């Protein structure tokens, strides 16, 4: 304690203060008094010692095999430094990892995930320590799959992480997969890596997005893709117009098997290089129509095959080509026989042409139904009529709703003859009013059906096209209507009953005048790609835009889509020899500007076979843009 001098003690005690202090005390300073005063000067304050504390930064880290992580030790109350250890072993060892005097920790070459504790102890007082936890991630494993262009990348990330793979022809990579989250309880994650050229070496590495939003990079791996027989590959020639900028992404083709090519689905880059294929290896003459990328990263395909329905198959496959679900026409008939829904107790020939996956997980499919009819116009004898049914399958693929063309349309209207009466080739869902819109090629109509998410009565709300419910604006009726069309799709919101519809107008038997003259006999048929603005209240259809600057004739199939960049892409599937109805055994896919006149930005020629549909998709992974 301070001596009581009768005056406040000075804030700072110097040697001169100490002398003056001694003069004011009644007795001379004793050794003890001097020691206490000197203690005050030195800051010991009666023998109290400064507390030592050690902390390490970062508190946790993720490291790969042999990767170096630098830790920093902060010591308060001492300047003598620290000694480093790993799992209690001074400087560590090859099993747990090593750490040098500067805090540089080198992870061990672990074959499985493990953890290590890095510690720093004060040299002055070894009981004062700080520690950090290191999660050591074993290198990923890359393996081949049944698809020679797809690798399976497996790695075990920390809990709460997500895994994506970046890959490319060198270590700058360039492409990435989507993110796959780690299992909640921990465990390995496998990602199928697709989008690589045939017979090429690629580099790839996993990117782990950790729970704290930091990232960890796996080591680089090399993978070499395989080859396919040259005779099985499509003949493709892709060209970008000089100065043109096509919509980025990849091209998804579903091909009609011709000759030796049995590949049902093909994905290419915009240079025409094949990046992914699927061979269904189905017997008979099954062909894909169509193939669509699902939100889970799988492809859903519909195959139209033999008329007995055995080879009419729907398949869901992953990128490696493994079938995860399938349903044959025969299995659909079994489900229909057991279904309690109204009208479901029928027999169908098989699924065909299109399907729609609904937001609630239901699947809408098109199937054929045959009936023998009598007394039809132009057919004095009984005749088999092939109509269509639209079937709603729930999440378990059980039929819960059915619509039949026989219940709603006039059998005496058969523009393209019999038995193929309706030939429905498109079904889409209208989310704004919960209706279904279908395209009937052989009626040259697009129909809207009261579906109401499975509660509708199936009433035909309107018929769009020649002899339908709408009047044509900005065009001449009947020749500017669409005929034998494909791939009708909504390209704008429909909340007010006014929306735009895009389709591919094949143009078969186009009616040229009021007397019913059709193309083909004298006037060549032409295909078009119109955008129609529909007003459901006034029942008007206004031609907003049409591509017919370079007339060509596709006598069957085809597709048309509005791209993200505003351009329009369409597939002239069944091209014919110019000026004739003779098939040319080729298809042309074009991306054009949405201008008048349209300008071609990009095109692909498919030689020796046909592309039933062609779609530009962002990548092989939902939500990822390449």
Labelled PLM ranges:
Residues 32, 38-57, 131-133, 137-141:
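Bacterial Sec-dependent N-terminal signal peptides
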């Amino acid at each position: 304690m301070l001596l009581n001098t009768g005056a406040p003690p000075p804030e700072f005690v110097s040697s001169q203060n100490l002398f003056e202090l001694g003069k004011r005390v009644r007795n001379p300073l004793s050794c003890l008094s001097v020691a206490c005063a000197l203690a005050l000067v030195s800051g010991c304050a009666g023998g109290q010692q400064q507390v030592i504390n050690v902390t390490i930064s970062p508190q946790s880290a993720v490291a790969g095999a042999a990767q170096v992580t630098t830790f920093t030790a902060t010591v308060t109350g001492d300047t003598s430094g620290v000694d480093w250890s790993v799992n209690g072993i001074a400087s560590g060892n090859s099993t747990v990892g090593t750490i040098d005097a500067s805090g540089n920790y080198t992870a061990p070459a672990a074959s499985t995930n493990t953890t290590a504790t890095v510690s720093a102890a004060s040299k002055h007082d070894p009981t004062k320590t700080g520690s950090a936890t290191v999660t050591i991630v074993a290198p990923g494993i890359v393996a081949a799959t049944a698809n020679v262009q797809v690798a399976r990348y497996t790695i075990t990330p920390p809990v709460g992480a997500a895994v994506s793979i970046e890959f490319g022809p060198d270590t700058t990579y360039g492409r990435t997969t989507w993110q796959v989250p780690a299992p909640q309880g921990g465990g390995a994650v496998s990602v199928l890596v697709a989008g690589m050229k045939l017979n090429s070496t690629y580099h790839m590495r996993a990117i782990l997005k950790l729970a704290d939003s930091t990232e960890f990079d796996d080591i680089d791996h090399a993978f070499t893709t395989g080859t396919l027989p040259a005779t099985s590959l499509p003949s493709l020639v892709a060209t970008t117009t000089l100065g043109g900028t096509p919509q980025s992404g990849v091209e998804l083709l579903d091909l009609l098997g011709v000759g030796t090519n049995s590949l049902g689905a093909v994905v290419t880059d915009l240079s025409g290089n094949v990046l992914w294929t699927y061979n269904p290896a189905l017997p008979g003459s099954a062909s894909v129509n169509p193939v669509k990328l699902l939100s889970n990263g799988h492809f859903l395909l519909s195959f139209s095959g033999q008329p007995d329905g055995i080879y009419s198959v729907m398949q869901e496959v992953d990128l490696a080509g493994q079938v995860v679900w399938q349903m044959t026409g025969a299995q659909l008939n079994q489900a229909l026989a057991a279904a309690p829904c109204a009208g479901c107790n029928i027999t169908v020939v098989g699924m065909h042409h299109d399907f729609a996956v609904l937001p609630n997980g239901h699947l809408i499919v098109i199937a054929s139904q045959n009936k023998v009819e009598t007394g039809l116009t132009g057919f004095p004898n009984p005749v088999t009529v092939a109509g269509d049914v639209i079937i709603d399958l729930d999440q378990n693929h059980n039929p819960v709703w059915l619509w039949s063309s026989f219940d709603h349309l006039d059998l005496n209207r058969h523009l393209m003859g019999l038995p193929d009466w309706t030939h429905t080739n498109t079904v889409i869902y209208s989310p704004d009013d919960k209706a279904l819109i279908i395209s009937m090629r052989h009626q040259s109509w697009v129909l809207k059906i009261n579906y109401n998410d499975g509660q509708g009565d199936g009433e035909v709300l309107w018929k769009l096209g020649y002899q339908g419910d709408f009047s044509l604006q900005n065009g001449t009726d009947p020749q500017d209507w669409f005929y034998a069309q494909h791939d009708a799709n909504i390209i704008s919101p429909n909340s007010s009953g006014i929306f735009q519809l895009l389709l591919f107008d094949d143009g078969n038997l186009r009616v040229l005048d009021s007397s019913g003259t059709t193309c083909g006999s004298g006037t060549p048929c032409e295909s078009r790609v119109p955008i129609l603005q529909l007003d459901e209240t006034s029942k008007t259809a206004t031609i907003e835009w049409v591509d017919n600057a370079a007339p060509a004739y596709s006598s069957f199939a085809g597709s048309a889509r509005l791209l993200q960049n505003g351009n329009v892409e369409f597939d002239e599937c069944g091209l014919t020899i110019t000026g004739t109805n003779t098939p040319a055994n080729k298809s042309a896919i074009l991306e054009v500007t949405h201008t008048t006149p349209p300008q071609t930005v990009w095109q692909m020629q498919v030689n020796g076979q046909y592309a039933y549909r062609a779609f530009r998709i962002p990548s092989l992974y939902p939500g990822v843009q390449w």
